């Protein structure tokens, strides 16, 4: 779990992930990976925990091979004013970049703290849906391809149909997750 503080609440349940990151439970977040998060509060308030020695997609039974964590993390703050024209300019969700892929994280509710109202932190456990998470991952990947690769909506959807893999990230953390993966090599040699 790596995330930042959301702006909607002073105290937040650490189990459901959201636009701020948190308990995303994507095993690809590890050595050599880069995570990008939108900063919602002054100071960002980064937190990390719940490391796994191994985990498959879905974390189906609610746990992975839990372990302690000792690591070196590099935190880089990208000021919003410097992001114009980059893939991070309109980022409002956790984005994972590996050496070979970009991954968008979709959730049942992109911002459950806002969307589900006053009781959101308990309601999220009753309202999660893989269908909703898939729709969110689809929307995020479509926007990513249009905004960062200059594709039309039709081009983005066509490319997603042949080159984007969707997987269930987790179905145990309240705000269920689906990730959309596209290989960077698809764009090798592309002229913008």
Task: Tell me the role of every PLM-derived stretch.
Residues 20, 27, 31-39, 69-71, ...:
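Long, compositionally biased low-complexity segments
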Residues 38-40, 76-78, 159, 181-183:
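Generic beta-strand/beta-sheet core signal
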Residues 1-30, 36:
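Intrinsically disordered, low-complexity linker/loop segments enriched in Gly/Pro
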Residues 16-21, 55-56, 137, 152, ...:
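Short, glycine/acidic-rich beta->alpha junctions
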Residues 27-30, 65-67, 137, 170-172:
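Solvent-exposed alpha-helices and their adjacent loops that cap or buttress functional pockets
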């Amino acid at each position: 779990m790596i995330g930042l503080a959301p702006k909607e609440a002073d105290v937040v349940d650490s189990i459901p992930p959201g636009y701020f990151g948190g308990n995303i439970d994507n095993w690809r977040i590890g050595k050599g990976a880069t995570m990008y998060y939108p900063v919602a509060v002054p100071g960002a308030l980064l937190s990390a925990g719940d490391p796994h020695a191994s985990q498959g997609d879905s974390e189906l039974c609610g746990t992975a091979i839990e372990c302690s964590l000792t690591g070196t993390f590099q935190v880089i703050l990208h000021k919003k004013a410097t992001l114009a024209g980059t893939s991070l300019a309109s980022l409002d969700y956790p984005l994972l970049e590996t050496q070979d892929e970009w991954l968008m994280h979709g959730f049942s509710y992109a911002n459950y703290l806002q969307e589900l109202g006053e009781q959101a932190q308990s309601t999220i456990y009753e309202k999660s849906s893989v269908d909703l998470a898939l729709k969110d991952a689809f929307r995020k990947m479509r926007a990513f391809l249009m905004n960062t690769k200059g594709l039309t909506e039709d081009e983005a959807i066509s490319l997603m149909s042949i080159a984007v893999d969707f997987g269930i990230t987790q179905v145990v953390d309240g705000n269920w997750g689906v990730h959309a993966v596209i290989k960077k090599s698809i764009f090798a040699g592309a002229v913008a």
